[in-house]
Amino acid sequence: MREETREQAAPLRSGLTTGSCATATSLAAARLLLTGQRHDAVEITLPKGKVVQMRLEFCHLKGDMAEAGTLKDAGDDPDVTHGALLFSQVRLRAEPGVRFVAGAGVGTVTRPGLVLAVGEPAINPVPRKMISDHLLQLAGDCGYHGGFEVTVNVQGGEQLALKTMNPRLGILGGLSILGTSGIVRPFSCSAYIASIHQGIDVAHTNGYTHIAACTGNASEDTMRRVYNLPEIALIEMGDFVGAVLKHLRKVPVPRLTLCGGFGKISKLAAGHMDLHSRHSSIDLPQLAGWAAAIGADTALQQAIIAANTSQQALALAHAAGIALGDEVCRHALVFARSVVPAQVQVEVFAIDRQGGIVGKAGVA
């Protein structure tokens, strides 16, 4: 078994979510309004009870509101928001409770199918609860019986959002304020997996019966070319094919096409649901065995086992007239069908680095 990319293991530092940042800055601004107290840092309690302290970049009054800001620290996670300035503006209001507003750089929901209603600011349920819990606790401590209006902003968020799946999900104008635990765990990719689930939900809610889950840009381009699918029906799954297959147990979209590079599809064929090289490897002896099943002689099998990459193995098989691409897709199809409900029609495409189709299975 060989990995096709080299990964370097090292201790990694956790960070804090945009939801934690919004909670800290909202609390600091509200405290300034109610008590006049201004601090360089603020403590918040995360959903599982851990108390963390977050440094503030500023906290001041501005007209009838207070605003406070902090720099998003995602630790060692490759988060698009790492280093961004997130700030909250808080106003007092007569009505009890907390009203949320999307400020500059925070998106608004424009399509049904997400956990938030159309027209709502893209501040997810757990961050909303974190902010509300902290502000209502502060109100109780201060003897304040009114409510709060909280506007969350992310500097440069509208441009940063173009690097996320928000536009495809129908979240327009900026980023989402996210988090379930309050902590960003490096390479846990929980936000990415959540966006995969959201993409499926949005496509299903909006009446699309055929979705294509793709590992990258080349496979997306292939699906556009083959099926002319709209953006909303293209699910950017990356390495997380398991996130797609398992979610279809809850949301059984009638037709699913899986499309990816030959190497990644060979991992799926071997039963892997995380296709990243950290978690699964190319099994060249298995590729040789599949080639043998469709006529490869001993010399070709040995050449496949000795290949440097799956692409080289595929090229060797192709030169010998052995349809290894189709055979790998067939095994991937069998595995995918074993995970999703029986009523979901599944098909699999494997492509080369240029987007050319090198194998397919389950295609009518």
From Swiss-Prot:
The EC number on file is 2.1.1.195
An example of a GO molecular function for this protein is: cobalt-precorrin-5B C1-methyltransferase activity
Q: Which cysteines are joined by disulfide bonds?
A: none
Q: Quick one: which pathway?
A: Cofactor biosynthesis; adenosylcobalamin biosynthesis; cob(II)yrinate a,c-diamide from sirohydrochlorin (anaerobic route): step 6/10
Catalyzed chemical reaction(s): Co-precorrin-5B + S-adenosyl-L-methionine = Co-precorrin-6A + S-adenosyl-L-homocysteine
- Gene3D superfamilies, alphabetized: CbiD-like
Protein's GO biological process:
anaerobic cobalamin biosynthetic process; methylation
Which branch of life, at top level? Bacteria
* SUPFAM superfamilies linked to this entry: CbiD-like (SSF111342)
Task: Name the InterPro entries for this protein.
Answer: CbiD, CbiD_sf
Alphabetically ordered keywords of this record: Cobalamin biosynthesis, Methyltransferase, S-adenosyl-L-methionine, Transferase
What top-tier enzyme class does this entry carry?
transferase
**PANTHER family hit by this protein:** COBALT-PRECORRIN-5B C(1)-METHYLTRANSFERASE (PTHR35863:SF1)
Q: Which HAMAP family match?
A: CbiD
Q: Which family does it belong to?
A: Belongs to the CbiD family.
Full protein name: Cobalt-precorrin-5B C(1)-methyltransferase
User: Which organism is this entry from?
Assistant: Pseudomonas entomophila (strain L48)
In the UniProt record, the gene name given for this protein reads cbiD
